[in-house]
From Swiss-Prot:
Protein name: Pentalenolactone D synthase
Keywords recorded for this protein, A-Z: Antibiotic biosynthesis, FAD, Flavoprotein, Monooxygenase, NADP, Oxidoreductase
Function summary: Catalyzes the flavin-dependent Baeyer-Villiger oxidation of 1-deoxy-11-oxopentalenic acid to pentalenolactone D in the biosynthesis of pentalenolactone antibiotic.
Gene3D superfamilies: FAD/NAD(P)-binding domain
Species of the source: Streptomyces arenae
């Protein structure tokens, strides 16, 4: 292959898109796009009681926090707080037709052995995952003290009482010995920052707030309300890849507006074979999770237990592309080998498009020209076929994006496309780019009145991404200064295991307060900065998108990076820390 020619093509695709696009957050005049369409609001009286633990966020991270604390500490009163109408997090909000996990269900859905659940498919539907998360909440008694349809407005530390004061938009003011925040990655929807956004007179909504009252149907399809409708979708990421076949089946006309094409590989979904679980030994899920984690981090294993496109593709590329801490061999030769392997994989995906899409011009427009991990890979067995339907039009904007909206439609490439319904598949506020407290919607006031928004004004400061000096009995679950991996649920499982261990130590040793020491925090921050710039060159050569801050990776604070030594090493750091038993880097009082 002519590697320089490949690089030049990728550069052209990057450069014609410029540096990113602007977004409009779903707040203020656009807050309707973030309202809950699924659960009718219920009124209640404010609470002024006390709990052992307040957990902000009732998604996978919040549920695992509650479950681990129940298992490890025996703490009785654990209160989940969420603005949604139930547990589930992203699986509560995302109910769009076709929604599924893109990581194998057997390694993604947490606590399968503990709950006694076996997923019905290799890649479960959103409703199946949501129901499983509800079962977790029931099993561990997490509904009992939960507050739904409730937004935290402030967390404030009371030093004399060694308690957190939790204020909410319902007038609650209650106390908690510990607080844990797990606000998630897909917490707040964002819209494209388009001229005319406020003037569009048709029906519109964000995919994470799906309006089934308008479209009809449910998460499995059956969108009968779209039979006579012209529908537009802005965005071609993983949501649209799953959604498009259902829209195409029911809409009179479907326009898919594309800035950058997705890289779509085979999904290969299948039902769980009868009796599959009968031969599984105790501990099977953790072993399977760790096997997947290692393979997708470039660490060879004796066996590939998952055997999907994540493991088959990522295992070939990850050693050279991802920061695993393995520095063996000539770095330049490793990089070249990785680049060649990357090109071969992307050529495979581009060839698949030619084999499926019948119109040559449409096929050409759907081809992604960037490296594998510039964007999260997509997997689907029906998306590309959608573009063979006569009622579907791909509006490729040549990397420029939609120009503007009018009262009746969407303008792209100088042409107006009239639509009755406009669906925004434009993602969420990004945790690396949007300040934590802004994305959370509240500030955290620690010892001496210091606000987290002030302490983190130039970027995060933590120990292991979990605890912050000056904020006692407080835990934050995120990817910032912590491990990052394609299986987010696994990483949350490891973080919450660590959190519960720390709380257990505090309780067993008779202390009231635990926090990161100043020295412990400083040492971890130095390690984050030392490793933070490792993937900047890679990201700078990607087309603009979520991972590279819309083409400006250098514009993100390095302090907000994930741990640069790889997620496997991050998990090992936490395990070695627990095994040492000396609680290094913490202060207990």
């Amino acid at each position: 292959m002519d590697l320089e020619a490949v690089r030049e093509k990728y550069r052209q695709e990057r450069d014609k898109r410029g540096v990113g696009r602007t977004y409009q957050f779903a707040r203020g005049d656009f807050s309707r796009y973030a309202r809950d369409p699924y659960t009718e609001r219920r009124e209640r009286e404010p609470l002024t009681d006390e709990v052992d633990v307040a957990v902000v966020g009732a998604g996978i991270g919040g549920l695992l926090t509650g479950a681990r604390l129940r298992e490890e500490t025996g703490l009785e009163r654990i209160r989940l707080i969420d603005e949604a109408g139930d547990v589930g997090g992203t699986w509560y909000w995302n109910r769009f037709p076709g929604v599924r996990c893109d990581v194998e269900s057997y390694v993604y859905m947490p606590l399968l052995e503990e709950i006694g659940t076996i997923p019905t498919e290799k890649y479960s539907t959103g409703p199946e995952i949501f129901a499983h998360l509800q079962r977790i909440a029931h099993r561990y008694g997490l509904y009992r003290d939960a507050l739904f349809q409730t937004t935290v407005t402030e967390l404030r530390w009371d030093e004399a009482a060694a308690r957190w004061l939790v204020s909410t938009d319902r007038g609650d003011l209650f106390r908690a010995r510990y607080v844990a925040m797990s606000i998630g990655l897909m917490h707040r929807p964002k819209l494209p920052g388009l001229p005319g956004l406020e003037t569009f007179a048709g029906h519109s909504f964000h995919t994470s707030r799906w309006d089934f009252g308008y479209t009809g149907g449910d998460s499995t399809g059956g969108l009968t309300g779209l039979k006579d409708k012209r529908v537009g979708v802005i965005g071609t990421g993983s949501t649209t890849v799953q959604l498009a076949p259902h829209l195409a089946e029911w809409a009179e006309r479907l326009y898919i507006f594309q800035r950058t094409p997705a890289a779509v590989d085979v999904r290969g979904n299948r039902p769980t074979p009868p009796g599959w679980a009968d031969g599984l030994d105790a501990g099977w899920q953790q072993r399977r999770m760790e096997n997947f984690h290692a393979l997708t981090s470039g660490i060879p294993q004796d066996e590939d237990l998952v055997q999907d496109r994540w493991t088959q593709t990522t295992a070939e590329l990850a050693t050279a592309i991802l920061p695993t801490g393995d520095t063996g061999g000539d770095p330049k030769e490793r990089a070249l080998a990785a680049e060649r392997a990357d090109f071969r994989k992307m050529e495979e995906l581009r060839a698949r498009i030619d084999s499926v899409v019948t119109d040559p011009a449409t096929a050409a427009a759907l081809k992604p020209y960037y490296r594998v991990y510039c964007k999260r890979p997509c997997f689907h067995d029906g998306y590309l076929q959608t573009f063979n339907r006569p009622n579907v039009t791909l509006v490729d904007t040549q990397g420029q994006g939609v120009e503007r909206l009018t009262a009746s439609g969407v303008v792209a490439n100088g042409r107006e496309y009239p639509v009755d319904c406009l669906i925004f598949a434009t993602g969420y506020e990004h945790e690396f780019a949007v300040p934590y407290t802004e994305r959370a919607g509240y500030d955290i006031v620690g010892r001496g009145g210091v606000r987290l928004s002030e302490k983190w004004a130039q970027g995060a400061h933590t120990l292991h991404g979990l605890q912050v000096h000056g904020f006692p009995n407080c835990f934050i679950l995120s990817k910032v200064q912590a491990g990052r991996h394609v299986n987010i649920a696994y990483m949350l499982g490891e973080q919450t295991r660590h959190l519960a261990h720390i709380v257990k130590c505090v309780e067993e040793r008779g202390h009231r307060v635990v926090e990161a020491s100043e020295a412990g925090e400083k040492e971890w921050v130095e390690e984050i900065l030392r490793l933070a710039s490792g993937d900047l060159d890679f990201l700078e050569n990607c087309t603009p998108g979520l991972y590279n801050n819309e083409g400006d990776p250098g514009g993100l604070p390095l302090l907000n990076s994930s741990y640069g030594g790889g997620s496997v090493e991050f998990v090992n750091i936490l395990r070695r820390w627990r095994e040492a038993g000396d609680l290094a880097g913490l202060e207990l009082r």
